[in-house]
Amino acid sequence: MITSPSASRNSDTDLVWESSSSSSRNNSSAVASKPFLHSVPPSDPLRQANRLPIKILKMLTARTGHILHPEYLQPLPSTPVSPIELDAKKSPLALLAQTCSQIGKPDPPPSSKLSSVTSNGSSEKESKSGPLKLSDIGVEDKSSFKPYSKPADKKDSSSGVSSGEKSGFRVPSATCQPFTPRTGSPNSSTSASPMPSDGKGERDEKKDSDCNKNCSSDGSAPTSVSHSRISVSCAGINVEVNQHQETTSGSKASATSDSVSCVTSSSSASVLGSGLVAPVSPYKPGQTVFPLPPAGMTYPGSLAGAYAGYPQHFLPHGGSLVNAQLASSLGCSKAGSSPLAGASPPSIMSASLCRDPYCLSYHCASHLAGAAGASCTHDSAAAAAASALKSGYPLMYPTHPLHGVHSSPPSFGGHPLYPYGFMLPNDPLPHVCNWVSANGPCDKRFSSSEELLNHLRTHTAFTGTEKLISGYPSSSSLASAAAAAMACHMHMPPSGAPGSPGTLALRSPHHALGLSSRYHPYSKSPLPTPGAPVPVPAATGPYYSPYALYGQRLTTASALGYQ
């Protein structure tokens, strides 16, 4: 407001301002109807107060095309789509949902990718009308991922095998089915998809039962006929192996082929029937990677189980052993025996191992026949296995010479296994010399233990021992101790009268020295003075504690001045 020094002048201007404002109000309606023409000049203070800066005007009138992303500036589709639907399809949230719904689907061919880029239709339209789309494998709804839904082709292929069809003429299915573990019976070795046990499974079970009858009918039968079927299928490509073998006991047939022929009818159907290719395994019969009992062997009565995995040149008489082995493995199998039962020794081997802490060798093998008869319910199979082993198979354990020993004839000059005899009682010449020298095993046979002891004195008479230790005190006891130490690994009685310190047997059943003569390094030695022989009580007889050897060594060390 403009002020003036005089009040009269001030009132005059107020009247003029009011009259001008009232006249402008009256003319406002007329101005609005006409083209906009400012009646007030630009220098008017009202117009100057309502002006906007030029920067703001430029910002408001500038083009906003560069702000938008080029993906949102695509041309409109040919099909009429509402703008709301278009915005919903192209929003980032909708694109994210569409991407997540396509996870796990098979990749579409490039033509359908192009069509999905150009067309903005719904995904259902696209999946039904898109060209060259991959056929959906049993998945009807494309917008949702169902990983656990079963494909429709599986149902067709599993139900397509009727009871009259053979597996070799099965129609190949369109897709390769995934291998599933078999849940059916282990005898029906058919395709990888689990099937109901129809006529084909019954035929397989009949075949296997016939095999069991033929193999386990008689342990000493001259001929054993066996069948085995192995079937592996993938997408209708069936591979079948049918084996039909006849073995005569007179011929030298290898144990590997025979154990394959009859044991696989029960074990390989469950191992190979699942459709998986089984690798070479030491526990599989017929693949002699390592001489272990095969998987078809079961614990009771299988005396020949330890030899069924050996190659042919290890076994001199193949036929009778194989018949007895098959009879014992198939006839004496328990219902609850696992397929890995052959990985450990049979029950006869484990039951007759001596658990005495003084026992230093496998000296309980004379009880093998009794353990076989006790653990096997089929006495004929056990007797057949024992009679097959009568012909002589080497065992990898050293045996005690004073027990009943049955050894093979001395024909194992370059045998790769441990060349000591396997022991079975009731033989006319049960005592065999097991002495091993640089020329090989002695293997001489005697009818009584006295003759064997007299013969063993020829082995234990070391010529150089007296000369070596003659300069030391107590030379007689030292010589006998040295001779005993030389023969210790075979548990042979060396030279010396019964009851002398040099007489060293395996162990006494009830020896009097016991643990008291054990060598304790941090205690005072209770042994007698050096030079005196170690006393043996009369109750022990010809036996002597093996731990008294520690006393002899201690006596030797103290005599030489080492203590």
Swiss-Prot record:
It comes from the Eukaryota. Residues 19-33, 112-122 have a biased composition (Low complexity). One of its GO terms (molecular function) is zinc ion binding. PROSITE patterns: ZINC_FINGER_C2H2_2. Residues 1-48, 101-226 are annotated as: Disordered. A zinc finger (C2H2-type) spans 431-459. Keywords: Developmental protein, Metal-binding, Nucleus, Repressor, Transcription, Transcription regulation, Zinc, Zinc-finger. It is found in: Nucleus. Residues 199-211 have a biased composition (Basic and acidic residues). Interacts with nlz1. Required for segmental gene expression during hindbrain development. May function as a transcriptional repressor. This is Zinc finger protein 503. It comes from Danio rerio. The lineage of its organism: Eukaryota, Metazoa, Chordata, Craniata, Vertebrata.
